[in-house]
Amino acid sequence: MEDTLPRNFRGINLGMVLEELKTVLMEDALFNFRGDRDVSFLPAREESLVETTGLSFVKRAFFQLREGELFIMAFTLNTDLVDHYSIFTSLVEKYGQPNSLNPRQAVWETETTRLALERPLTVKYIDMTVFNEIIDEAATVESAEIRSRQEFLDGF
């Protein structure tokens, strides 16, 4: 699949900075964003999490930022107003068949973007470049911990 997957939803773009995200959320009537009280900082991981409720079609929205830039956005949709089949059909019409499909989720993926439709009804956009960096960093830390543990055990 070519890199044709969207990296934005209603003016919210993967890669945008926190202040831009807050401005867009404040101006969009689909979200009930309350400003800084909807923002949590995770200093140990240089990450921020913005969680807000939505109005009408969106029940909840989550935005995860790393080093100040948005890399995951997830929208839990209101199943009273929209259904899984309608969203799935719309995504297939726009982006073709998913790269992977199972009872829990449908995933469209390119080198830079993952778009996932999860059950019961959540749509996620993920910046794969940042996501893969996090996975690589975690593997490096785990490898160092394993080595350290082995060195400790070898001391006996």
Predicted feature residues:
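Non-cytosolic coordination micro-motifs
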Residues: 1-38, 42, 74-156
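Mid-chain, structured segments of secreted extracytoplasmic proteins
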Residues: 44-82
